[in-house]
């Protein structure tokens, strides 16, 4: 669930290029009275403290935040990151595309203002909730395998997977349709499948 929301226009202290205005719908007029990043840097830093930074293509978004925090005299974010592009590739391997707008369409997530930071953040949060739900349904053996592989991921997902595994192990048996063979969870063959 979403615990808190924060959204603010930021005055970039320079003109917004026309192509950015066309992409985002944010004009120079809309930000002329907004605070520069320095004035909200402390709030942003506080929100990031002891938190995961979740984004769709996390290093792209984080690079802007890092640059602005540093320019404002604040410490760079050093916490864990979760990349919903990477995680979507894992839990939705059959998706036609991993663009945020197309994943939203496929998962029936309403995305009214693509390329606007607040709208993108909102739907990325919803996408992440879908990812967590999908992970929660995976068999413990699959989660354990993912956890072992996660050391090579962009996403710092190991602790998240550990929490899901711990919760799943409270339900000690695998679902009826799953069998584990050499630590790999696979769907059992149904008798009907063998007869066709």
Show where each model-derived region lies.
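Acidic, divalent-metal-coordinating active-site segment for phosphoryl/phosphodiester hydrolysis
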Residues: 116-131
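Conserved non-catalytic scaffold segment of RNase H-like nuclease domains
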Residues: 1-78, 93-115
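Conserved beta-strand -> loop -> alpha-helix junction used to position metal-binding or nucleic-acid-contacting
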Residues: 75-88
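Acidic two-metal-ion nuclease catalytic site recognized across multiple nuclease folds
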Residues: 129-196
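Acidic active-site catalytic centers that drive phospho-/nucleotidyl reactions
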Residues: 57, 61, 83, 120
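Buried hydrophobic packing segments
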Residues: 65, 87, 124-128
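Conserved NTP-handling cores and scaffolds of large molecular machines
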Residues: 92, 107, 131-135
């Amino acid at each position: 669930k979403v615990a808190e929301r924060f959204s603010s226009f930021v005055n970039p202290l320079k003109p917004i290029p026309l192509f950015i205005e066309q992409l985002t719908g944010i004009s120079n007029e809309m930000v002329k009275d907004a605070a520069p990043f320095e004035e909200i840097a402390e709030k942003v830093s506080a929100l990031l403290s002891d938190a995961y930074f979740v984004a769709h293509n996390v290093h792209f978004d984080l690079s802007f935040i890092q640059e602005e925090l540093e320019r404002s005299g604040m410490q760079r974010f050093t916490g864990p990151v979760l990349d919903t592009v990477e995680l979507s590739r894992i839990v939705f391997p059959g998706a036609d595309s991993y663009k945020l707008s197309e994943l939203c369409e496929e998962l029936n997530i309403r995305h009214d203002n693509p390329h606007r930071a607040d709208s993108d953040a909102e739907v990325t949060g919803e996408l992440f909730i879908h990812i967590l739900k999908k992970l929660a349904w995976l068999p413990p053996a699959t989660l354990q395998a993912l956890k072992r592989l996660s050391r090579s991921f962009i996403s710092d997902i190991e602790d998240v997977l550990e929490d899901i595994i711990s919760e799943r192990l409270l339900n000690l048996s695998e679902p009826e349709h799953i069998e584990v063979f050499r630590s790999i969870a696979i769907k059992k063959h149904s008798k009907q499948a063998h007869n066709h």
